[in-house]
Amino acid sequence: MTNSIQLLEESIADKIKNYQKHLNYWEFNDKHVDIWIKQFPEEEREIVLTETDSLLSHNYIKKSKIKEFFEEIWDTKEIMGTNPIMSLNQIQFLNIQIKGHSQKRLVNLLEEYYLKSKGITINRCNHMNVKKYIYLDDCMYTGLTLMKDINNWIDNMSPNCDTQLDVIFLGEYNGNCDYVEGCLIKKCQEKGITVKIYRMYEYNNNLHYALPYDVLWPQYMDDDEYVNAYVQYMEEQKTITGKGGLGFRNPYLGEESDLFTSSYNRVIFEKALLKKGAYICSLPQNRNERMKPMGYSHGISLGFGAFFATCFNISNNCPLAFWWGDLRSSSSETLGKWYPLLPREVN
């Protein structure tokens, strides 16, 4: 092992050492990182580690960053008014997520933080005198979860009419944002509820916006058996469904996304993740149709390509090589054929 590899492994391990500490079942140290990286070809390892370390520096959300997020909410007059303590008497924090634990966890943390730091409790269930509802979550990817939750809330939970809904995310991928906001506004109009969306971090994956993109989206490659097989599968799906798809990105020579250390490294990194993701896609006998090398996604594509993780969990919209697999499974089992860096807690 070279000194640079060891330093990178230690740097990554230091960032993720408290990952899923609430589950208390694994030690995320430099040995853990070393096992993960050795699944990649030796010539790719230093770049994969370098770019992974960079992604974690930007988009791995520790508890301290979550507390900063709560303070930003408190200090934002458009959300909390000029007197947050008084405003809280008319605010309800929603816990309406149909699938997953991220909203409940965040609201619990916010309640605990405001009680300790502000000496005040929040309203989580009482509609009386409520003039504003707050929908809190860690990150918006496609927005489908948000839309399902709000549709169900409007249809079945009798929110107060003529109020306001503030949707607040730690992070937001903007590719579907305009469509989602339009759907929310239309649905909430049934109750006279106005909608505003806030985010702490915004990531560009909107094909109509200027480059660069803040997602992992590989350029073309044709020298890997698993990638070739997956691309062939994509072409077959296009023929069967009569639908188009989103394939490889075009080369880009402009200023690079801050998430990556260089354009050169980014290209190699994305291809490395694609190759391992395509291999992982080949493992299950009955693969979920949303399972794609660069992360779960609807439609015909290489995958969503997000990278956003908290100290509690990582999204399945991230490339499979980061999270797919089971640390406790043997190599003879399907889930034991890949060792994840950030194993995912399934919703």
Residue ranges and their predicted role:
Residues 2-90, 100, 155, 161-347:
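PRPP-dependent phosphoribosyltransferase catalytic core
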Residues 92, 96-105:
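A glycine-rich, hydrophobic loop/mini-helix early in the fold
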Residues 92, 132-134, 166:
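Structural motif
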Residues 109, 149-152, 183:
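Alpha-helical scaffold elements adjacent to nucleotide-binding pockets in ATP/GTP-utilizing enzyme cores
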Residues 109-118:
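Short helix-loop-beta junction
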Residues 119-130:
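Short acidic low-complexity segments
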Residues 136-145:
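Ser/Thr-glycine-rich phosphate-binding loops at phosphate-binding pockets of nucleotides
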Residues 144-149, 178-181:
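A short secondary-structure junction signal
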